[in-house]
From Swiss-Prot:
Gene Ontology MF terms: deaminase activity
TM spans (from-to): none
UniProt entry keywords in alphabetical sequence: Hydrolase
Family statement: Belongs to the RutC family.
GO cellular component, one term: cytosol
Catalysed reactions, semicolon-separated: (Z)-3-aminoacrylate + H2O + H(+) = 3-oxopropanoate + NH4(+)
Protein name according to UniProt: 3-aminoacrylate deaminase RutC
Amino acid sequence: MPKTVIIPPGTGTPIAPFSPGTLADGIVYVSGTLAFDKDNNVANPDDAEAQTRQVLETIKSVIETAGGTMDDVTMNHIFLTDWSNYQTINKVYAEYFPGDKPARYCIQCGLVKPGFVVEIASVAHIGKT
């Protein structure tokens, strides 16, 4: 099964050996996405609303670069550092998924750098390769 690496225009260099997304068999797999600034530092440290919005915009960019839309998302994997941010993350999340909601799960855990509060990985079915 061939795969295509998805790198949206203007995307910075990842800090680890991964691609922002891959497309295979009509499915877009979006890597775990964090809110980095242009210098690969934490953007909006400890701000759940701003980070969630930035993360979802980045995910949207990957999916749109692959030829899909956020309506094509079938699964989200959400990692948060503190359950006290859960409702804030949900509020922003609902803006990006106003209709039928994709499947998802949330896990509380530590993230790669202090100041990050949310990481999201997504899967979208766009029906083409």
